Amino acid sequence: KMYYLNGNIQSEISYKKDVRDGITRTYDPNGKLKVEVSYQNGVQVGVQKGYYPSGKLKIELPLDKNGLTNGIVKIYYPSGKIMSEKSYKDDKLEGTVKKYDESGKITSEEFFKNGNRIK
């Protein structure tokens, strides 16, 4: 664990045989969770999560064992409502990208193939 000068926790990092393994959490100076990342044998895997100072979820970023973005990246408004959903394959946009207003209504929808917009 690492701490800020004010005594609040700055980060918690799990190691296995001197290599990051498990959940790593980073906090702001007020002790609020900012980022949560899972590691397996030194590589980021699973869904990386970022948080607003309020504690509400800001972003979900799915990573594979190679550290590439694979899956649906979700970004949220500070209210907690979904702002956008972007489908990725091997770090490139692939499939549907949807954007929403704060009421939940879809404001735009685009389609991508291999990182290129097709519609």
Please annotate each region the language model reported.
Residues K1-K119:
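Glycine/tyrosine- and acidic-biased, solvent-exposed loop/turn segments at the edges of beta-strands
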